[in-house]
From Swiss-Prot:
Lineage: Bacteria, Pseudomonadati, Pseudomonadota, Gammaproteobacteria, Enterobacterales
Disulphide bridges: none
Enzyme class: translocase
Protein name in UniProt: Phosphonates import ATP-binding protein PhnC
Residues annotated as domain ABC transporter: 5-253
Length: 262
């Protein structure tokens, strides 16, 4: 099975606090993987390293690859990082869309990487590109909002627009950081259904950080759980039982309660 993401010996320190400890991880083509863990466990930090938004410590042997290309090595971004980013769609808790633009215009932004520079300066997109953008919006159930300003949409609708933009980008990997954290249950379900649909039907590899364990168990076949910057569990969601849940979350809560009491 093709390895899409490879992480070796990744460490990260913030203000003398070790957020990640020599993390090693392989993610394969077509997987939908949930990153779980308590607040401060390092799951969002790990995801941001995969995207090249932040760099790790300058540790010997640390290395991140995405689609066979180096993202960063020993604390330095690869010179051709843009080539990795061109194949990666990003979805964040804070909706990273342009509020003053329409839904369709936001989705067309996904085509910028494959559009000649002079066209991007004037936002000149071809008829074929606009048709593909409408098809992407149809996939996520948002085509009827195509000419509406993004700022008028609900949180769940904005997340679906972000997914449509990743489809427009023809991303091979989607990295989603807490995409349902601020959504109501019905909107969260729709967003997760959409991610699973493109994973299963388009073969797009999806890595998603979640606080909601029930969504991880329902939608993701594999769980990678982090605890205090270490990989605590990496395996099937079916084997992530109550005992592992207790060790991952409740023991951390007891440590925090004891610290407050002291």
């Amino acid at each position: 099975m093709q390895t899409i993401i490879r992480v070796e010996k990744l460490a990260k320190t913030f203000n003398q606090h070790q957020a990640l400890h020599a993390v090693a991880l392989n993610i394969h083509h077509g997987e939908m993987v949930a990153l779980l863990g308590p607040s401060g466990s390092g799951k969002s930090t790990l995801l941001r390293h995969l995207s090249g938004l932040i760099t790790g410590d300058k540790s010997a042997g640390s290395h991140i690859e995405l689609l066979g290309r180096t993202v960063q090595r020993e604390g330095r971004l690869a010179r051709d990082i843009r080539k990795s980013r061109a194949n990666t769609g990003y979805i964040f808790q804070q909706f990273n869309l342009v509020n003053r633009l329409s839904v369709l215009e936001n989705v067309l932004i996904g085509a910028l990487g494959s559009t000649p520079f002079w066209r991007t300066c004037f936002s000149w997109f071809t008829r074929e590109q606009k048709q593909r953008a409408l098809q992407a919006l149809t996939r996520v159930g948002m085509v009827h909002f195509a000419h509406q300003r993004v700022s008028t949409l609900s949180g769940g609708q904005q997340q679906r627009v972000a997914i449509a933009r990743a489809l427009m980008q023809q991303a091979k990997v989607i990295l989603a950081d807490e995409p349902i954290a601020s959504l109501d249950p019905e909107s969260a379900r729709i967003v997760m259904d959409t991610l699973r649909d493109i994973n299963q039907n388009d073969g797009i590899t999806v890595v998603v950080t979640l606080h909601q364990v029930d969504y991880a168990l329902r939608y993701c076949e594999r769980i990678v759980a982090l605890r205090q910057g270490h990989v605590f569990y990496d395996g099937s969601s079916q084997q992530f039982d109550n005992e592992r849940f207790d060790h991952l979350y409740r023991s951390i809560n007891r440590i925090e309660e004891n610290a407050k009491a002291a």
